[in-house]
């Protein structure tokens, strides 16, 4: 009887894990808030991309959430590969740790473009990206606030 119960619990646990992996991306996000505050540019089961409704903001934001394959998510060199890519494009690395990279992509004529990429496994294996176009230079704290805002969309 114990073996049967243990087997049943194992099957239920595997079913729960499998169900979590098969959920649509929107099941992890506050879609009501996103729909009310942003324009959804692209959406499918694996990713969603949304932008500010107010295009005249001083810091225009594009948010992108994407489910990743486990093998790619668990790659310990994913941030290093991103850093190498950005450095190859002559971008400035503002911040980097094991799960986040913040990059100044362009600074020209009082226009600044930033990319923030974060890998989050609190709900599922997600890549969170925020692209920012700004008419002023943003501080590291302001950029982290934008990352926090992106994470606030997670349920």
Range-by-range predicted roles:
Residues 1-4:
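Positively charged n-region of N-terminal signal peptides that target proteins for export
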Residues 11-12:
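Repetitive helical segments and hydrophobic/amphipathic motifs
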Residues 20-54, 85, 147-153:
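N-terminal "mature-domain start" segment
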Residues 31-36, 53-56, 66, 96-100, ...:
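Short, solvent-exposed coil/turn segments at beta-strand boundaries
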Residues 49-77, 125-133:
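A short acidic-to-branched-hydrophobic micro-motif
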Residues 84-121:
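Signature of long, low-cysteine stretches enriched in small and polar/charged residues
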Residues 130-155:
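Surface-exposed amphipathic alpha-helical segments
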């Amino acid at each position: 009887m114990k073996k049967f119960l243990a087997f049943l619990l194992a099957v239920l646990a595997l079913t729960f894990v499998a169900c979590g992996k098969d959920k649509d991306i929107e099941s992890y996000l506050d879609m009501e808030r996103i729909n009310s505050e942003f324009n959804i540019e692209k959406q499918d089961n694996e990713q969603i991309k949304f932008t500010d409704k107010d295009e005249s903001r001083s810091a225009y934001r594009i948010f992108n959430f994407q489910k990743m394959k486990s093998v790619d998510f668990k790659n310990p060199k994913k941030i290093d590969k991103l850093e190498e890519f950005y450095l190859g494009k002559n971008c400035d690395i503002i911040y980097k740790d094991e799960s986040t990279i913040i990059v100044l992509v362009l600074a020209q004529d009082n226009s600044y473009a930033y990319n923030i990429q974060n890998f989050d496994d609190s709900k599922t294996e997600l890549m969170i990206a925020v692209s920012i176009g700004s008419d002023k230079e943003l501080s590291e704290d302001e950029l982290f606030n934008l990352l926090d805002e992106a994470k606030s969309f997670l349920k």
